[in-house]
């Protein structure tokens, strides 16, 4: 019997058995946060679908974000790779990534709910940046929680968050990365849920967050369906997106979930090896298992006691130990395929598309592009669309060190001397 594809959750779960095996999602949170989540549920089914909210969000998407973002035909890459390669360029949205779609929608919802302060976690800094920008535009206080390691490797985004007026909290507990920032943000929300709104950055967490984030990010695939008609009359053959928590992938895939002839491929962080702690692969690995963490049930990299494992990726946005519940479900029912790309492959893909297409994709998006290059070794004449979820400006402290270490070291030394 064909397995049912859940395009939205039912009773908070994606999957046939509510809360049991083969069902992901749910609402596993401390009792103190239940009133806040019930309030959010009410807003999701009320304000979120109201004409007034939708009209204001549509206007902000156009006049503040700069939507629609373009669909670009990669002429040179297409010739070299012998397939028609298209790029949905979310990096040209305000703040440089797809994260603004979700952050702006949630901050606007917070304003309609009469909240005064916004809390958010961030890994690569793009969600924090987008949330800070949305708060600046809509006039709400903003506090961002970010791992100490991520702050060090994403300093440009931290500077810009603070420029937008946000207070950035450095999280020094645990692995000092995204999973620890999420924990701290949840703790803070539990203290002040009465006047604060938690803007969750990916399509995960307790219900209704996975649905809210998917709905807001699905503007990507909604636009894409219209844009492809200008290029070709048929459907694309393959869609490829990187997967950290899953927000850009769900936004990119949503309007194609029922188009079964379109292959949907998610690309995880292959890091530097296959051992535990050397990557962030949650699918097709013996290191991941079903579990409950940070408010939801899904597939996690975790130890035998259920503690989230350390991960690695050159990309700060892909090193999360869990995966969104809807993507876990879509993998289980066979609708979304998963691959991985190593740090090395991502850097090579970044260099390839920079050289031949004049774009600098974010390291996250470069993982998707690495998978595109690999796919093209075995297929020809297909229409392949990759989601460029963000620009690579934010990654200069990583990419410059990795690609031109001596030049970068010389530049930094000279700059320090000038400042001194």
Swiss-Prot record:
Pathway the protein takes part in: Amino-acid biosynthesis; L-tryptophan biosynthesis; L-tryptophan from chorismate: step 5/5
SUPFAM superfamilies membership: Tryptophan synthase beta subunit-like PLP-dependent enzymes
Pfam families, A to Z: PALP
Catalytic activity: (1S,2R)-1-C-(indol-3-yl)glycerol 3-phosphate + L-serine = D-glyceraldehyde 3-phosphate + L-tryptophan + H2O
One Gene Ontology molecular-function label: tryptophan synthase activity
Cofactor: pyridoxal 5'-phosphate
Keywords from the named record: Amino-acid biosynthesis, Aromatic amino acid biosynthesis, Lyase, Pyridoxal phosphate, Tryptophan biosynthesis
One annotated Gene Ontology cellular component of this protein: cytoplasm
InterPro entries: Trp_synth_b_CS, Trp_synth_beta, Trp_synth_beta/beta-like, TrpB-like_PALP, TrpB-like_PALP_sf
Record-listed N6-(pyridoxal phosphate)lysine modification sites: 99
Enzyme class label: lyase
This enzyme's EC code(s): 4.2.1.20
Binding partners and assembly: Tetramer of two alpha and two beta chains.
Protein task: The beta subunit is responsible for the synthesis of L-tryptophan from indole and L-serine.
HAMAP family registered for this protein in UniProt: Trp_synth_beta (MF_00133)
Stated family: Belongs to the TrpB family.
Protein name: Tryptophan synthase beta chain
């Amino acid at each position: 019997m064909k397995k049912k594809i859940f395009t939205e959750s039912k009773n908070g779960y994606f999957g046939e058995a509510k809360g049991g095996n083969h069902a992901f999602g749910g609402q596993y949170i401390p009792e103190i946060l239940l009133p806040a989540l019930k309030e959010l549920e009410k807003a999701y089914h009320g304000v979120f679908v109201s004409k007034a909210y939708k009209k204001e969000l549509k206007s902000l998407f156009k006049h503040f974000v700069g939507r629609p973002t373009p669909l670009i035909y990669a002429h040179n890459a297409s010739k070299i790779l012998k397939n028609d390669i298209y790029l949905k360029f979310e990096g040209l949205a305000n703040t440089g990534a797809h994260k603004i779609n979700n952050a702006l929608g949630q901050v606007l919802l917070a304003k309609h709910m009469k909240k005064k302060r916004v809390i958010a976690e961030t890994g690569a800094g793009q969600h924090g940046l987008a949330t800070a920008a949305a708060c600046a535009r809509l006039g709400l206080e903003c506090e961002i929680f970010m791992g100490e390691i991520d702050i060090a490797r994403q300093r440009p985004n931290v500077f810009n968050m603070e420029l937008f007026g946000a207070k950035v909290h450095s999280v020094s507990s645990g692995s000092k990365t995204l999973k620890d920032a999420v924990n701290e943000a949840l703790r803070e929300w539990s203290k002040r849920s009465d006047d604060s709104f938690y803007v969750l950055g990916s399509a995960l967490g307790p219900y209704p967050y996975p649905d809210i984030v998917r709905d807001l990010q699905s503007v990507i695939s909604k636009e894409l369906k219209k844009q492809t008609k200008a290029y070709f009359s048929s459907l694309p053959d393959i869609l490829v997106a990187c997967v950290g928590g899953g927000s850009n992938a769900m936004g990119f895939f949503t309007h194609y979930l029922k188009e079964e002839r379109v292959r949907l491929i998610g690309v995880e962080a292959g890091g530097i090896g296959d051992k535990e702690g050397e990557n962030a692969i949650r699918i097709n690995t013996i290191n991941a298992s079903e579990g409950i963490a940070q408010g939801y049930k899904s597939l996690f990299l975790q130890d035998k006691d259920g503690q989230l494992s350390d991960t690695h990726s050159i990309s700060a946005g892909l090193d999360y130990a869990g995966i969104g519940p809807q993507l876990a479900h879509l993998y289980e029912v066979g609708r979304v395929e998963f691959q991985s790309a190593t740090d090395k492959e991502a850097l090579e893909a970044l260099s390839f598309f920079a050289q031949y297409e004049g774009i600098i994709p974010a390291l996250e998006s470069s993982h998707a592009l690495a998978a595109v290059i690999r796919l093209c070794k075995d297929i020809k004449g297909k229409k392949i669309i990759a989601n460029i979820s963000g620009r690579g400006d934010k990654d200069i402290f990583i990419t410059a060190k990795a690609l031109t270490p001596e030049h970068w070291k010389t530049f930094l030394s000279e700059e320090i001397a000038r400042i001194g």
